Amino acid sequence: MDRRTFLKTATLGAMAAGITREAAAAAEKYFPVKADQSLFATINRAKDPAKLSPLEQKHVPVIKAPATVKAGEPFTVEVAVGEVVHPMGPTHWIEFIELNVGNEPAGRVEMQPRGFLNPKVTFTVVIPKDAAPAGKITLVAHQRCNLHGYWEGSVDVTVTG
């Protein structure tokens, strides 16, 4: 390798390293909150639904649905993220909310980190009679927070007639 090629390569490498360091510093300034990586290893659920931790209060999906529904008739299911309003800013937000009826996906809404919104979604659901042969079905909601991972909440619904 000649001297000129060596100097050119060394200079470009040094510049790239400097840019990378500057980009990392800018990212650190813009995204000051560190994410707890252990929250991304599994599906997070409330350890004790009667006594939620501050983290659980902001992240466990809360499902509001009738206790009893009639098969084949539409009803409303509201899914909110936590009992406490979750921030929706550029550094901390809910990416999506989804609802499953039993093991079947029913709907999913993608969220955007634009301002301080109240992440809450309303679904209109119809449960076919054959979907709940035992007369009960579980509604399962999931949400994903960019800093605190994937969270789940569920509620059982009685299905009649």
Q: Residue spans of the language-model regions?
A:
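N-terminal export signals
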Residues: 5-26
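C-terminal segment of N-terminal export signals and the immediately downstream linker at the start
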Residues: 20-63
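Structural beta-strand segments of beta-rich domains
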Residues: 73-77
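Short amphipathic, basic-aromatic surface patches that mediate peripheral association
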Residues: 80-89
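Short coil-to-beta strand junction motifs in C2/discoidin
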Residues: 89-95
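Solvent-exposed serine/threonine-rich low-complexity stretches and specific carbohydrate-binding patches
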Residues: 105-114
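Exposed aromatic-hydrophobic patches
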Residues: 119-128, 154
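Short acidic/polar inter-strand loop motif in beta-rich domains
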Residues: 144-154
